[in-house]
Swiss-Prot record:
Stored Pfam families: Ribosomal_S9
Keywords: Ribonucleoprotein, Ribosomal protein
One term under GO cellular component: cytosolic small ribosomal subunit
Entry-linked SUPFAM superfamilies: Ribosomal protein S5 domain 2-like
Listed InterPro entries: Ribosomal_Su5_D2-typ_SF, Ribosomal_uS9, Ribosomal_uS9_bac/plastid, Ribosomal_uS9_CS, Ribsml_uS5_D2-typ_fold_subgr
Lineage of the species this protein comes from: Bacteria, Pseudomonadati, Pseudomonadota, Gammaproteobacteria, Pasteurellales
GO terms for biological process, alphabetical: translation
NCBIfam families in UniProt: PRK00132.1
Species, as recorded: Haemophilus influenzae (strain ATCC 51907 / DSM 11121 / KW20 / Rd)
Family that this chain belongs to: Belongs to the universal ribosomal protein uS9 family.
Name of the protein in its database record: Small ribosomal subunit protein uS9
A GO MF term: RNA binding
Amino acid sequence: MAENQNYGTGRRKSSSARVFIKPGSGKITINQRELDVYFGRETARMVVRQPLELVXLTDKLDLYITVKGGGISGQAGAIRHGITRALMEYDETLRPALRAAGFVTRDARRVERKKVGLHKARRRPQYSKR
């Protein structure tokens, strides 16, 4: 299976994605399902395709992706990060364009923890002056 393929790992929130890139016709498979079947939301599909559209390789590469953990948004972000890393392994000259678009940087934002005495992370109980 290791014939002429490139690999990239992507993470976002609590999601982790493993991306394998091979020369092909532009087929994207996520957890043995098509991209359109796996992600019902158009925004998630758009996020996944962003790095490929940026470097104009949408119909030249096949992608095989396994993703675990998190929700739709986190998984889409993790896949985008993994595709970016795999593309850089595939062709190092793509790095400046991907960096300029902000795809290379790992989004380190996490869910803030709930604090004692508050409703949520920052939401305080209603204050009554009298």
